[in-house]
């Protein structure tokens, strides 16, 4: 693709991934024309919404599924290092947006919050202690604390310790104070507003992309429908970026590119218990993750989270899975069935055969009553009362199912997946956690994979936004500490000030 002074790019969806990519693109190529189309009436209504995302501030500080017990008994923390670095990269970009004036008032979307891991039982306690020792030895996590003392835990997680005094059992906890809670809905709204203000960008709500056709010159003709009037129009563009969350797979299929063929999706809703009693909410001030039950997928890790929503402190426990055919919370009951094609049906069937435990888990979760959910909560908070908690359905995640040389047909991919056409004109983001927390790294991956001819030109611009770009926070301890101190200042977190 030959370079020119100006290109057109269509961004589908006004969630955190599209707005992150758009915010980055308008800074490195201010002359490009950005067209954002969102089918709903405002940004961040689906999975990016603060009431819909399952967890926030994923930095591998407390999420035990990022540190894996090996057959020899050791703990592999490599994935935790990567996730932590990616979150540090996100914080740098957000800090840049604040410093440049693109967004304001960072404490409206990010707040300091301790991250705590909590386990019960002899084997889990051994795992947590071994994890602590492995992480403590690495500079990224050397501020981690560990205890098996119930008196210390009463100070860290007083609400969870209530009712355990007579029979505490075997338990342990680890803590890193320098964690965060991120309101991705508010962050997304701020970035969307900033994109709207850009002279070469348009953000149109109630506009749904319904079809694609690639022209002979390599450009794409994108058909857009105004959902209020029913009128359709065509937008010609050089690039198409599909950041539409659960709606990405059907849109990718409509492009007809070969890379869309052996892909499918398995939609899962998250359900949470939300506390309605302010007196209970005030007694918990942390993000506390447990360990997933044996034989269940990583999405099942239970956590009791302090979250800041609409400027108010809230308390959520979950997730509980709720399977249904919709790919989006505001989608159609036909979404799943329409996504089944002749070219991916064997992929989907293979996934069903290979993942019977996941299917059983999902079915068990669907039939679980509120009382069943409350019983799970009481393993964290023994004195939880039914009247203080309300069960609600969060957003949709669509687990990517694909064929791979390594795993064969029907492999379920956890995490975020970037799919692009061979000519790099179509880019789609599929999947889920830790998507939002690592959204900036995902945007960088999109840029590097799909715009290689701009790499040299863009590198200094990216480094201005993300000072660690091109360097490793995992390998360079001095740089890592410098970056953390700077982002804490930029985002008004109050860490590392001594």
UniProtKB/Swiss-Prot annotation:
Keywords of this entry: FAD, Flavoprotein, Oxidoreductase, Tricarboxylic acid cycle
Pfam families: Mqo (PF06039)
Reactions this protein catalyses: (S)-malate + a quinone = a quinol + oxaloacetate
A GO molecular function held by the record: 2-hydroxyglutarate dehydrogenase activity
SUPFAM superfamilies, per the entry: FAD/NAD(P)-binding domain
GO process terms (BP): tricarboxylic acid cycle
E.C. no: 1.1.5.4
Cofactor requirements of the protein: FAD
Pathway: Carbohydrate metabolism; tricarboxylic acid cycle; oxaloacetate from (S)-malate (quinone route): step 1/1
Residues annotated as transmembrane: none
Family note: Belongs to the MQO family.
This protein's name: Probable malate:quinone oxidoreductase 2
Gene behind this protein: mqo2
């Amino acid at each position: 693709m030959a370079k020119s002074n100006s290109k057109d790019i269509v961004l589908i969806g006004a969630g955190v991934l599209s707005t992150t990519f758009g915010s980055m693109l308008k800074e490195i190529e201010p002359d490009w024309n950005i067209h954002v189309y969102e089918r709903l009436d405002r940004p961040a209504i689906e999975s990016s919404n603060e009431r819909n995302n399952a967890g926030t501030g994923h930095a591998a500080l407390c999420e035990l599924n990022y540190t894996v017990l090996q057959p020899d008994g050791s703990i592999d923390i490599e994935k935790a290092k990567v996730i932590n670095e990616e979150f540090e990269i996100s914080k740098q970009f957000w800090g840049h947006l604040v410093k440049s004036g693109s967004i304001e008032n960072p404490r409206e979307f990010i707040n300091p919050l301790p991250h705590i891991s909590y386990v019960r039982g002899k084997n889990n306690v051994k795992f947590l202690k071994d994890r602590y020792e492995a992480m403590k030895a690495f500079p990224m996590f050397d501020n981690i604390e560990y205890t098996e003392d119930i008196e210390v835990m009463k100070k860290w997680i007083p609400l969870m310790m209530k009712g355990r005094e007579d029979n505490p059992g075997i338990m342990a906890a680890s803590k890193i104070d320098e964690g965060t809670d991120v309101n991705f809905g508010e962050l997304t709204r701020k970035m969307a507003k900033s994109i709207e203000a850009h002279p070469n960008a348009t953000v149109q709500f109630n506009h749904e992309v319904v079809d694609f056709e690639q022209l002979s010159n390599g450009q794409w003709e994108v058909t857009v429908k105004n959902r209020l009037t029913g009128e359709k129009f065509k937008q010609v563009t050089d690039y198409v970026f599909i950041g539409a969350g659960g709606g990405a797979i059907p849109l990718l299929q409509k492009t007809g590119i070969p890379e869309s063929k052996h892909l499918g999706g398995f939609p899962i809703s998250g359900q949470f218990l939300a506390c309605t009693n302010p007196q209970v909410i005030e007694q918990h001030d942390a993000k506390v993750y447990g360990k997933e039950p044996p034989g269940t997928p990583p999405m099942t890790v239970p956590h009791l989270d302090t979250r800041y929503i609409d400027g108010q402190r809230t308390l959520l426990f979950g997730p509980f899975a709720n399977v249904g055919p919709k790919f989006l919370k505001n989608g159609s009951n036909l979404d799943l069935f329409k996504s089944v094609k002749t070219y991916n049906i064997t992929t989907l069937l293979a996934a069903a055969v290979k993942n019977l435990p996941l299917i059983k888990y999902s079915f068990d979760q669907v039939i679980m009553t509120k009382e069943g959910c409350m019983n799970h909560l009481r393993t964290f908070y023994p004195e939880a009362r039914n009247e203080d908690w309300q069960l609600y359905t969060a957003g949709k995640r669509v687990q990517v199912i694909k064929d791979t040389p390594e795993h064969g047909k029907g492999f379920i991919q956890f995490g975020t997946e970037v799919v692009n056409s061979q000519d790099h004109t179509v880019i789609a983001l599929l999947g889920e956690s830790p998507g939002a927390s690592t959204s900036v790294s995902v945007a960088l991956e999109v840029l590097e994979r799909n715009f290689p001819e701009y790499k040299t030109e863009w590198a200094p611009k990216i480094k201005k936004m993300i000072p660690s770009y091109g360097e490793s926070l995992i390998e360079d301890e001095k740089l890592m500490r410098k970056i953390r101190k700077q982002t804490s200042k930029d985002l008004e977190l109050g860490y590392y000030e001594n």
